[in-house]
């Protein structure tokens, strides 16, 4: 992989990680369509770290509040809203961990193809449109309970399939339950933190075990470009969300899915 390809892939990761259009699909497609080499474990770790830093910076107040809520709960010996939100994020993370552990090899072997991406892009794009168009959009996260968190967590597990979009499917699930767009996105992005962190740690473990030679300059490029791009993308997405909803992303998914099917025909 050369520097130009690294720059493009870092930009793609930063732009697509938090938009409901599937980052994994957009990272797979350059190798499928353009014949680019695989980005490699080291660069994968770098762009995961970059996007993790971006979402943690944007939601730093929520993260600080959750930690403070845990301390306050111990002191007062009762639950509070901040600790509750943190526990619900942890609970909703479990299905993705379980299904990832059980099905990762099958997914890597059988589902990383342009055809699968085309189908999931269209199907889950349609579900995103339906939940946004017909969801009540009246509840705040204060209403979220165990059942809702598990439902969103199970939806997140589907994002292991390339083309689904982790943010897209979790926002779809939250909208279907009647949550407001901004609250659906907030829970989705908070939910991304343990998932990205876990994926990054696993890849780091593989990196160490395989004794991969690391190009530190290219790693730095991946971290910086993906972090800055991801942060700006989150800012843009949250501001756009209440004004126009999910329609632009649904249209994009429709165009991408149909274009892929024509390319495969």
Swiss-Prot record:
GO terms for molecular function: undecaprenyl-diphosphatase activity. It is found in: Cell inner membrane. Keywords: Antibiotic resistance, Cell inner membrane, Cell membrane, Cell shape, Cell wall biogenesis/degradation, Hydrolase, Membrane, Peptidoglycan synthesis, Transmembrane, Transmembrane helix. One of its GO terms (biological process) is regulation of cell shape. The keyword Transmembrane applies. It catalyses: di-trans,octa-cis-undecaprenyl diphosphate + H2O = di-trans,octa-cis-undecaprenyl phosphate + phosphate + H(+). Pfam families: BacA. It is a multi-pass membrane protein. The chain crosses the membrane at residues 1-21, 39-59, 83-103, 114-134, 144-164, 188-208, 218-238, 244-264. Its EC number is 3.6.1.27. One of its GO terms (cellular component) is plasma membrane. PANTHER family: UNDECAPRENYL-DIPHOSPHATASE (PTHR30622:SF4). Belongs to the UppP family. NCBIfam families: PRK00281.2-4 (NF001393), undec_PP_bacA (TIGR00753). HAMAP family: Undec_diphosphatase (MF_01006). Catalyzes the dephosphorylation of undecaprenyl diphosphate (UPP). Confers resistance to bacitracin. Bacitracin is thought to be involved in the inhibition of peptidoglycan synthesis by sequestering undecaprenyl diphosphate, thereby reducing the pool of lipid carrier available. This is Undecaprenyl-diphosphatase.
């Amino acid at each position: 992989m050369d520097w130009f390809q690294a720059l493009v892939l870092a930009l793609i990761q930063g732009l697509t990680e938090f938009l409901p259009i599937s980052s994994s699909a957009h990272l797979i497609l350059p190798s499928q369509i353009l014949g680019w080499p695989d980005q490699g474990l080291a660069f994968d770790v770098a762009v995961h770290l970059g996007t993790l830093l971006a979402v943690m910076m944007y939601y730093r107040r929520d993260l600080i509040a959750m930690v403070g809520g845990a301390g306050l709960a111990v002191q007062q010996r009762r639950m509070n809203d901040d600790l509750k939100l943190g526990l619900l994020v942890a609970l909703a993370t479990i299905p993705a961990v379980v299904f990832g552990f059980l099905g990762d090899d099958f997914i890597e072997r059988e589902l990383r193809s342009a055809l699968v991406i085309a189908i999931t892009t269209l199907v889950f794009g349609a579900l995103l449109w339906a939940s946004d168009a017909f969801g009540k959009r009246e509840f705040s996260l204060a209403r979220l309970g165990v059942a809702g968190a598990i439902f969103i967590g199970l939806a997140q597990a589907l994002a292991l399939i390339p083309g689904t979009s982790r943010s897209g499917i979790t926002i779809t699930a939250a909208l279907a339950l009647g949550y407001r767009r901004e609250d659906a996105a907030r829970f989705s992005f908070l939910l991304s933190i343990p998932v990205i962190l876990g994926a990054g740690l696993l890849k780091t473990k593989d990196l160490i075990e395989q004794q991969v030679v690391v190009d530190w300059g290219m790693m730095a490029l991946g971290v910086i470009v993906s972090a800055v791009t991801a942060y700006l993308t989150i800012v843009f997405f949250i501001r756009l969300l209440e004004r126009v909803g999910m329609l632009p992303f649904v249209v994009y998914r429709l165009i991408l899915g149909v274009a892929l099917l024509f390319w495969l025909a």
